[in-house]
Amino acid sequence: MTDQIRTLQGRVVSDKMEKSMVVAIERVVKHPIYGKFIRRTTKLHVHDENNECGIGDVVEIRECRPLSKTKSWTLVRVVEKAIL
């Protein structure tokens, strides 16, 4: 049996913490009654060892063991840097 490590892509919404950031993961779900597609957002705390990300960057993250009370994801790579 193989365990696949979950990886997601999202946008950095906060990088004010030391070695940490908040990433917003956006998904589209269908409303159960009306059938309209709605955007839903989940915010995750992510470990950024080298402080290489800034607000607006698109990043790839993967799940890991719990690093703190709220942080159990780590940065894999920066997919796209934000244009400021």
Swiss-Prot record:
The answer, when asked if Lipid metabolism is one of the entry's keywords, is: no
Q: Which Gene3D superfamilies match?
A: Nucleic acid-binding proteins (2.40.50.140)
> Can you tell which superkingdom this protein's organism belongs to?
Bacteria
Single annotated GO MF = rRNA binding
Q: Which GO terms describe its cellular component?
A: cytosolic small ribosomal subunit
Alphabetically ordered keywords of this record: Ribonucleoprotein, Ribosomal protein, RNA-binding, rRNA-binding
Name a single GO biological process: translation
The annotated subunit structure for this chain is: Part of the 30S ribosomal subunit.
Q: Per its database record, what is this protein's job?
A: One of the primary rRNA binding proteins, it binds specifically to the 5'-end of 16S ribosomal RNA.
Which family, according to UniProt? Answer: Belongs to the universal ribosomal protein uS17 family.
Full protein name: Small ribosomal subunit protein uS17
Q: Print the organism lineage.
A: Bacteria, Pseudomonadati, Pseudomonadota, Gammaproteobacteria, Enterobacterales
